[in-house]
A protein has these predicted regions:
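Extended hydrophobic secondary-structure segments that form protein cores and membrane-embedded regions
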Residues: 107-109, 222-223, 267-274, 317-321, ...
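Short secondary-structure subsegments characteristic of cysteine-rich extracellular domains
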Residues: 99-115, 238-257, 395-403
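Primarily extracellular Gram-negative trimeric autotransporter adhesin
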Residues: 2-10, 18-29, 53-55, 143-203, ...
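Outer membrane beta-barrel translocator domains of Type V secretion systems
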Residues: 163-363, 480-482, 487-494, 500
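Structured binding elements
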Residues: 386
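Outer membrane beta-barrel transmembrane domains
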Residues: 300, 375, 382, 391-503
Length: 503
């Protein structure tokens, strides 16, 4: 049955049967064991089903159209003058809604009598823009009615009750609920701008070991580094918790070396890399999660100047520029994946000054030279995602490209040489460094104009420790582990291994 219907008697929708309504009044009772289709073929919300008697749900389905936004959003609606009982599944199709913060919610079902019936969304939630809507009972004078609300009902996924037997209740004072997908978009844009970011010692290890054959002429060398890292971050007022694992491979080599005054040294080289990251965002307010994936490449140039080529003390300046391109994906439970790309340039200028702080002998014939090296670095991060519209109609625009990251720190290390290594060119250099890192922008995503941003990463403290070693005149190795800590639960831990071969 379909169309505008007025009936004075009762109506029973049997299993396997459907009642399609536009503006319908049932003078008696309605039992639903099949499907009551509220949404019209044209898709425009506004249909009303009025039941003058009682409504009984026999595990039937009701479908509604709604333009999901604030409290006054257009929607299909059922008005029951009598009582409700039984269980009913509800499907809501969003028709052009961009999402918004609700107060009381969008009224879907109005009940005049005893409201003992239970209504639950078939998918648990419905999404629009950055917001997640649930179906919940009202409070106070509206406690009999059912609303679509983007407010948190106070229940976490870990202890979510059966919505049929324990229906949630709308609290107008509760905070809004954001989609977990927001955390995945944020993680991807942050990774696109930082995966290939590095420092001079990340790329070449200890400069004292650079060009160990330069006394015999201009040396050639190739280097490679591997990085693995794990990041934890939060977004959306702390309700979205993201963990991400990454891998980076970079390699390169010098194109040219020269001196301008027989004391300094210039290096010009090329480099390229591959990286990927997989993130998982879990909401503490809704029971589904989101996965983010990014993988891509970079290629570019680097240039380095050392004031004192003989022992690499004094000042140094290092710079690099990379073009980066990535493929991105965001997917979530029972929702279609969103694939998009990102492109852009990252560039850095780093400077420091190395001075010898002292020399002492160890107990077993080791000669140790202590160095201190203050450092400063500015990195411009210009990788941008392509603005696009998801299949569900949500407009996606990420923010944070153009971030300027500033690093100030100090590194101290010991250059150790044991007397049994005389004539073997073998040296080891343990070190520790501490840094303060500032980001000028917050990585964020706008979903239909609503911004959700990463938290706790504007200012970071970092500690690194590692060892650098010259195995022989041809081979150098280096490795380190480091931890960055921010506020609001932000942390990043990584390990790196590098190798360079000269000939």
């Amino acid at each position: 049955m379909s169309g505008n219907v007025t009936t004075a008697g009762d109506m029973n929708v049997m299993p396997g049967r459907a009642l399609r309504v536009a503006k319908t009044t049932i003078g008696g009772n309605l039992e639903n064991g099949g499907t009551v289709q509220m949404n019209s073929e044209g898709g425009k919300p506004g249909n009303v089903l009025t039941v003058n008697g009682n409504y009984t749900g026999n595990n039937g389905l009701m479908t509604f159209n709604a333009t999901l936004g604030g409290d006054n959003s257009p929607t299909d609606k059922m008005n029951v003058k009598g009582d409700t009982q039984g269980n009913t599944r509800v499907r809501v199709d969003n028709i052009g809604g961009v999402g918004a913060q609700t107060v009381n919610g969008i009224e879907l079902i109005e009940v005049g009598g005893n409201s003992a019936g239970n209504f639950a969304l078939t998918t648990g939630t419905v999404e629009a823009g950055a917001y997640v809507y649930t179906l919940a009972k009202g409070k106070g004078n509206d406690e009999k009615n059912w609303y679509l609300t983007s407010k948190w009902d106070g229940v976490t996924p870990a202890d979510t009750p059966d919505p049929i037997n324990n229906p949630p209740v709308v609290d107008p004072e509760s905070p809004s609920v954001y989609r977990p997908e927001a955390g995945s978009y944020i993680s991807n844009i942050a990774a696109a701008n930082s995966l290939f970011s590095h420092r001079l010692h990340d790329r070449l290890g200890e400069p004292q070991y650079t060009d160990s054959l330069h006394s015999q002429g201009s040396a050639s060398s190739m280097w490679m580094r591997h990085v693995g890292g794990h990041e934890r971050s939060r977004a959306g007022d702390g309700q979205l918790n993201t963990q991400a694992n990454r891998y980076v491979l970079q390699l390169g080599g010098d194109l040219a070396q020269w001196s301008s005054n027989a004391q300094d040294r210039w290096h010009l080289g090329v480099m390229a890399g591959y990286a990927n990251q997989h993130s998982n965002t879990q909401s503490n307010r809704v029971g589904y999660k989101s996965d983010g994936r990014i993988s891509g490449y970079s290629a570019g140039l680097y240039a380095t100047w050392y004031q004192n080529d003989a022992n690499k003390t004094g000042a140094y300046v290092d710079s690099w520029a990379l073009y980066n391109w990535f493929d991105n994906s965001v997917s979530s439970d029972n929702r279609s994946a969103d694939d998009y790309d990102s492109r852009g340039v990252t560039a850095s200028v780093e400077g420091g000054y190395t001075f010898e702080a002292g020399t002492f002998s160890g107990s077993e014939g080791t000669l140790n030279t202590w160095y201190v090296q203050p450092q400063a670095q500015i990195t411009w991060m210009g990788v941008k995602d392509s603005d696009h519209t998801r299949k569900d109609g949500t407009r996606i625009e990420t923010e944070g490209d153009g971030n300027v990251q500033t690093r100030l720190g100090v590194k101290t290390y010991l250059n150790s040489h044991h007397q049994r290594d005389d004539g073997k060119q073998r040296e080891f250099q343990p070190y520790i460094e501490a840094n303060w890192i500032n980001n000028s922008k917050v990585y964020a995503v706008k979903m239909n104009g609503q911004t959700v941003g990463r938290e706790g990463a504007r200012n970071l403290g970092e500690v690194r420790t590692g060892v650098e070693a010259k195995v022989n005149n041809n081979l150098s190795l280096w490795g380190n582990v480091g931890v960055q800590l921010g506020d609001k639960g932000y942390s990043d831990t990584q390990g790196m291994l590098g190798v360079k071969y000269s000939w």
